[in-house]
Amino acid sequence: MSRKLESIPEKTRWEMATKGLTGAYIAISNALQRAAGKEKFEEFNGNFWHEAGKGAKEFAKSIGLPTDTPENIEAATHLLAQVSMGPELQIEVVESTKDRCVGRTTQCPWHKRWQEQGVGFDTCGVGHQRWGDGAVEAINPGFTFKLTKNMVRGDAYCEWVIERKK
């Protein structure tokens, strides 16, 4: 069986896994929001992604990533997101200082599945914010995360700020 798996190019396997994961979660989110309502969905989704974000600390530690500056924290969360979401995810840093780093997603598998499935509500805002909260708090509690733009809400890109606490 492994020979059959190895006959599929790695990029194709990664794309299929990404589409399967993000597509399934968007479909589940849609069903859950319809069954439980917006408030309960956002409560569940926020808690789910906050806990998931906490794994960023172990990820960064396991591969020896520095986490002492906003840019290092963004790089660690960026790499974890890229590994988790595959080649559809396109992220860039648009600002970086000693106290603040601004990241931007211009292509996102979650947003693509949201469009493909015609989901009519914000499946990402609370989850993205809470994932960022969990990740940044776990990696370095001296910093905060704030989602400032969201493609699902009509922005041209998603954007977030990692900032030193004042």
Regions found by a protein language model. Name each.
Residues 1-100, 107-126, 137-138, 142-157, ...:
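N-terminal accessory segment detector
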Residues 127-132:
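ATP phosphate-binding glycine-rich loop and adjacent ATP-lid/helix-beta elements
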